[in-house]
């Protein structure tokens, strides 16, 4: 029997869009977009965080000023209820993805387990 795993993946993608977790995240993004101040703050925080991560990946140091700016932005971001709600929904989606990843990688884990530490 030939299995087209990509058809299964595409079906999973369609089903994911119908989950409560994804719908909740989409609604949280809609709520964020309705609050211009929170949206601007969120976008600025994401940009600063991405820039810092990029520097780290390139082996560059992040300055003390950059760290302080990111920390201040993080404090401002977490003070916004709409962003806190979004972050909670992101965590729910992330949990779902982690669980799916465990299921999907189950066959690989079984293969490698045979070479793991032996009890006895």
From Swiss-Prot:
Pfam families recorded: Com_YlbF
InterPro entries cross-referenced by the UniProt entry: Com_YlbF, YheA/YmcA-like_dom_sf
HAMAP family: UPF0342
Family, per entry: Belongs to the UPF0342 family.
Protein name: UPF0342 protein LAF_1331
UniProt lineage: Bacteria, Bacillati, Bacillota, Bacilli, Lactobacillales
């Amino acid at each position: 029997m030939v299995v087209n795993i990509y058809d299964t993946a595409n079906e999973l993608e369609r089903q994911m869009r119908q989950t409560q977790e994804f719908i909740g995240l989409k609604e949280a993004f809609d709520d964020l977009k309705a609050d211009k101040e929170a949206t601007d703050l969120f976008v600025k925080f994401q940009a600063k965080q991405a820039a810092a991560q990029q520097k780290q990946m390139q082996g560059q140091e992040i300055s003390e000023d950059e760290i302080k700016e990111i920390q201040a932005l993080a404090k401002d971001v977490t003070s916004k209820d709409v962003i806190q709600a979004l972050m909670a929904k992101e965590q729910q989606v992330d949990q779902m993805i982690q669980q799916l990843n465990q299921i999907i990688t189950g066959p690989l884990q079984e293969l490698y387990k045979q070479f793991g530490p032996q009890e006895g």
